[in-house]
Amino acid sequence: MPPPTTPTPNPSIPQKATLTPLPPFQPDLYQRAWSSIPHPTLPLLATGHAKSVTVFSLATLSKHSALTGGHARSVRTVAWQPARGGGTGGGSGGKRLGLVTGSFDATAGLWSFEGDADAAAGGGGGGLEREVRMGGGGGGGGESEEEEEVREWEFNLVLEGHENEVKSLAFSPGGQYLATSSRDKSVWIWEDVSSGQGGDDEDEWETVAVLSEHDGDVKAVAWCPSNLPNARAGVGRQHNSSEVLASASYDDTVRVWREDADGEWVCVAVLEGHGGTVWGLQWEGKERQDGRFPRLMTFSAGRVRSRVWTLRVSGFGGVPSTMRRSLREEWDCTAVLPKVHTRDVYSVSWSADTGLVASTGSDGIIAVYAEESAPEDVAKSGVEGGAENGTSGPKSNWKVLGTITRAHGPYEVNHITWCKRFDPGAEHKGKEEMLVTTGDDGVVRPWQVRIS
């Protein structure tokens, strides 16, 4: 019998990731920082810490501006506000640059960047580079009162209703809805009922739903991205909701929510299987080759820390029917990421460009994963069901490309995100990705990622 041969690696699948620390963002915050959120199109990064938010320039890796005075306790979570009617929330057309903050004081706050919005948001490209360099924290001094005024944020509106701290918040892709979650076990959905399209119009939001089906703190909320063809077309959907929300909880479950035909927000699926608190979740942002609905990744405490969930496609397909279909959905766990972490996973980021996943947590480890080719035969994958019962497709396998230990020394790492590079060391500014981690040490650290 001939000796077994080693399989030849698939050249299309990355085999190794090398992480190299870049100079940290300046200045150091010297206090626990919770998360750093990149703007979807502009070279800006918002970091929540203490009672404020520091906005960094991705072009200079230094401070651009700060949001202070809106909260009585620490800012736990931050999100960039999409422009009304869609878009990216700043720059062209005179639309404001906006942020929302969630705090331990049980409120959420809406902020706007005052001054030349077009310059601040990069109208035409050159304006933002001048603005972020002007706002760099290099201690250059000599700024005029007028220049200082350009970088001011205004606290426009406070959203009250939660009984305890706001753990997470997220805007729907079009900006119409804002979801907030709290230690009070609830998810609130707010609707933007402002009349204008930006400029000097006042923010006006009203509560449209309070979702109280979780049995524990709701740690995170996330809206399914709508920029993917399969999400826009409603592939795999069982009714006409245009927005899909997922929530993760201390009760060890994830819930999926949609708006029904009567305009009520309802739970359409409960994802169970984690053996501990589900700390958060991430929707797949890269279009799937099989044209299916975006998958959902969840991460938690417990033995199995990171799972991938896939919506089971209805076996009815496009056959017309006069019967009203159930809003109930079936989601299957179709992948479990390899075990790397020794303690709770606090944060995962799923790149919309490459499909690579990065994770971090209380053990201070950073891990990067790639998805390997899925099995060709659905039956071999262990997924049950057929044309009649519906399927979620074949299961997939993931591999670890690389790890870093003690990413922030002895401190826990609270957040990780993929982020476009605009700094002088980038080979392809605005296209090349790096990782950014945020820790208990108050350091916001960028990492160069080399894939081979």
UniProtKB/Swiss-Prot annotation:
This is Probable cytosolic iron-sulfur protein assembly protein 1. Pfam families: WD40. Residues 1-24 are annotated as: Disordered. It comes from Chaetomium globosum (strain ATCC 6205 / CBS 148.51 / DSM 1962 / NBRC 6347 / NRRL 1970). One of its GO terms (cellular component) is cytosolic [4Fe-4S] assembly targeting complex. Residues 1-12 have a biased composition (Pro residues). One of its GO terms (biological process) is iron-sulfur cluster assembly. Coiled coil: none annotated. Transmembrane segments: none annotated. InterPro entries: CIAO1/Cia1, WD40/YVTN_repeat-like_dom_sf, WD40_repeat_dom_sf, WD40_rpt. Essential component of the cytosolic iron-sulfur (Fe/S) protein assembly machinery. Required for the maturation of extramitochondrial Fe/S proteins. WD repeats lie at residues 70-121, 161-200, 213-267, 273-319, 340-379, 411-452. Keywords: Repeat, WD repeat. Belongs to the WD repeat CIA1 family.
